[in-house]
Amino acid sequence: MDEEYIALLDRAYKLVAPKAQRRAEIPKIEVQNMPRKTVIPNFGQIAKRLNRDIYFMAKFFQRELAVPGTVEGDVFTLHGEKSPKVVEAVYERFIRYYVVCPVCNSIDTELRREGRIYVMRCLACGASTPVKPL
């Protein structure tokens, strides 16, 4: 009975593991500097991939970088020059605070507002964690 169980468990892991690894890929952010502004052309695609509202992400970037910005379609424009390294650091901070599950480290999460607080619920392990409000 134990050998049969182990064989079934191995089979299940082989079927499930590749999907979980593929899901854990965090998209790269593209940063383009222009005179007096910084453009992120793949911002909407990142928001969809991370299952986050594009305006919520934009608000986080604006507050962290202390510059105004606009969202036009999938493109996010910051009205001020910021180096790509600084923008990437803010992106990593956003992922750490608002995307990655602190229990299982999965990015398969959703963010909901319950009253005055935001709650991040992991779709992989089911954990609910309150996060900092913006």
From Swiss-Prot:
The keyword Transport does not apply. Pfam families: eIF-5_eIF-2B (PF01873). One of its GO terms (molecular function) is translation initiation factor activity. The keyword Protein biosynthesis applies. It comes from the Archaea. Transmembrane segments: none annotated. Keywords: Initiation factor, Protein biosynthesis. eIF-2 functions in the early steps of protein synthesis by forming a ternary complex with GTP and initiator tRNA. Heterotrimer composed of an alpha, a beta and a gamma chain. Belongs to the eIF-2-beta/eIF-5 family. HAMAP family: eIF_2_beta. This is Translation initiation factor 2 subunit beta. It comes from Pyrobaculum neutrophilum (strain DSM 2338 / JCM 9278 / NBRC 100436 / V24Sta).
